[in-house]
Amino acid sequence: MAPVSGSRSPVREASGGKRRSSSRSPKSIKSSRSPRCRRSRSRSCSRFGDRNGLSHSLSGFSQSSRNQSYRSRSRSRSRERPSAQRSAPFASSSSSAYYGGYSRPYGGDKPWPSLLDKEREESLRQKRLSERERIGELGAPEVWGLSPKNPEPDSDEHTPVEDEEPKKSTTSASSSEDDKKKKRKSSRSKERAKKKRKKKSSKRKHKKYSEDSDSDSESDTDSSDEDSKRRAKKAKKKEKKKKRRGKKYKKKKSKKNRKESSDSSSKESQEEFLENPWKDRSKTEEPSDLIGPEAPKTLASQDDKPLNYGHALLPGEGAAMAEYVKAGKRIPRRGEIGLTSEEIASFECSGYVMSGSRHRRMEAVRLRKENQIYSADEKRALASFNQEERRKRENKILASFREMVYRKTKGKDDK
């Protein structure tokens, strides 16, 4: 062990340490400067040296030279020995082996190569994360290429016919608005012209009236009568004019409302056409609740009507059921004729059942029939009661009829 360690020079070991250190990443350099990392690495180096038959002095010296060589080559050469002295308290076994010539094994937690690998993996992972974030924000045009600023319209969504139709509709709407404005302007100008004419006519009338008053100044009584007549005529004319104006205004309003309604209906039809241009307009839409094609209309025959499962008792059925009730047996249903009630009960216990809807219907019929069963005395009492009621009704009707006949005949006799 000792002669092998003595044969190598510390300068060569330092140079070897420099070469090894040049292949490392910069993050591992910073982490190796901490005292804990130095401690663990010195321990791992000592173990590694023992396994390969090398002394602890070489490993300690190489570790110190590695730590210092990352700063600069010029500084590392001058500070090799002091750095070895600094690392001596943390790796006492390595320094004692170098100066004293004996070695003492010191157990470390983990070998330093595994820590370096972890640090490298961490740095690579951080780089990948940052690259992914950058690509997510900016994109990668060299891989995917830039997306088009104005995407081309899809052939299915935008057809040239559909693109032309909205243009036509907009032009038609604008033209209709212009026509409305022109009509309003023309109506206003007409009203102004009418007002001017009325003013002129009123002025002329005033002039004529003044001339007449000058000429007829001698006869005041005649002029006063004429004035009153004229005033009455003027008032009548004004009333007539007002009525005419009101009628004209109403007509104009009705015309405008009609035009607006027609315009709104045309706009709605245009919007509907834009929504679905392929819809058939010739056929009027009829609200139908049914969805899908209509079933062929066939005349309902008597065979198609639902079967009546016997609401009333058949002849002789009531007596047979009464016998079953007296015996305390189950009344057989109509669908179960041919079997005894005991057989039917055994079948039902073993799990044989009728179809659900038929079973329910039959059960209801059975219960109703059980309620319909009366004894002989009850039947007699009911028959007598019914006969009495019928006689009373008949007597009332006959009496009322006799009274009516008597009145009619009595009236004829009196005449």
From Swiss-Prot:
Residues 1-309 are annotated as: Disordered. It is found in: Nucleus. Residues 23-32, 54-71, 84-108 have a biased composition (Low complexity). Keywords: Acetylation, Isopeptide bond, Notch signaling pathway, Nucleus, Phosphoprotein, Repressor, Transcription, Transcription regulation, Ubl conjugation. GO terms for biological process: granulocyte differentiation; hematopoietic stem cell proliferation; hemopoiesis; negative regulation of DNA-templated transcription; negative regulation of transcription by RNA polymerase II; Notch signaling pathway; positive regulation of alpha-beta T cell differentiation; somatic stem cell population maintenance. One of its GO terms (cellular component) is nucleus. Residues 116-136, 156-168, 259-270, 277-286 have a biased composition (Basic and acidic residues). The modification Phosphothreonine is found at T159. InterPro entries: NKAP, NKAP_C. The modification N6-acetyllysine is found at K110. Residues 212-225 have a biased composition (Acidic residues). One of its GO terms (molecular function) is chromatin binding. There is a cross-link at K283, K305 (Glycyl lysine isopeptide (Lys-Gly) (interchain with G-Cter in SUMO2)). Its main location: nucleus. The modification Phosphoserine is found at S7, S9, S62, S147, S155. Residues 177-272 are annotated as: Necessary for interaction with CIR1. Residues 33-44, 181-208, 230-258 have a biased composition (Basic residues). Belongs to the NKAP family. This is NF-kappa-B-activating protein.
